[in-house]
Amino acid sequence: MTHPAYGVLRQVSPTASVLLENNPSSMTLEGTNSWVLRAPGASSCVIVDPGYDDRPHLELLAAVAPVALILLTHHHPDHADGAPWLASAVSAPVRAFDASLCLDGDALQADEVLSVAGLEIGVLHTPGHTADSVSFRVGGEVLTGDTILGRGTTVLDDLGAYLGSLRVLAELPEGTPGLPGHGPELPDLRATAREYLAHREQRLDQVRGALRELGPDATPRQVVELVYADVDRALWVPAEHSVRAQLEYLRTL
């Protein structure tokens, strides 16, 4: 698969540019968005989510500008695996919410504000996709990692935590641009978060209906076969992961 954005740093806003990694799949869409944050006129930059340990992609990131900091939205390999090589290549620290991912830097804290490379970057802890998922607020924009994608919906570990994260994002100012970990930019992240909330409530209603039909001890696979009968079977494995999170959520109510 080819894509015109592979290998090309694309300016999205005065502060943010994106380099699309060539790792397309049903889960990553066209590939991982590696974000380069750079204040106008600044000599250095911040890189968010270097992606896989893909040397051509990482070498392009390393060549953009001196790198002051590498940030990770979460631990999944399509976002984080390239961080150690890039950190060594550009002599920059790595920071993430999960301390085990950090290199020469402290773990990120919820609501922390980072002052780096002429930027003020706010840390929003947005768990649900993973426990360590964070979003970054830079100026009027928010980098969402896999918490909200540019297209479609994300896979969940913890639905209760995820609904809380969506409610936080749903209170952002109207028209806040969203810069996701996969897929195109979102013109209004608040509106998208509210759409995600409505979608999750709809899915929960479907799962409740499936449990009424199948019985309270139905397995995630049985629920997927009923609720996702009209969905491509290639997506049933991630759907089963999300249904498991929904069942766990419903069984704690």
Spans of features found by a protein language model:
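Active-site HxH/HxHxD metal-binding segment of metal-dependent hydrolases
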Residues: 23-31, 45, 50-122
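C-terminal regulatory/interaction regions
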Residues: 210-253
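A structural signal for the main folded, soluble domain(s) of proteins
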Residues: 9-11, 36, 41-44, 67-70, ...
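Glycine/proline-rich low-complexity segments that form flexible loops, beta-turns, and polyproline
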Residues: 1-2, 129
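Histidine-centered divalent metal-coordination motifs
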Residues: 73-79, 129, 182, 246
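Metallo-beta-lactamase
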Residues: 42-47, 52-53, 120-125, 130-210
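Conserved beta-strand hairpin/beta-sheet module of binuclear metal-dependent hydrolase folds
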Residues: 2-63, 134-147
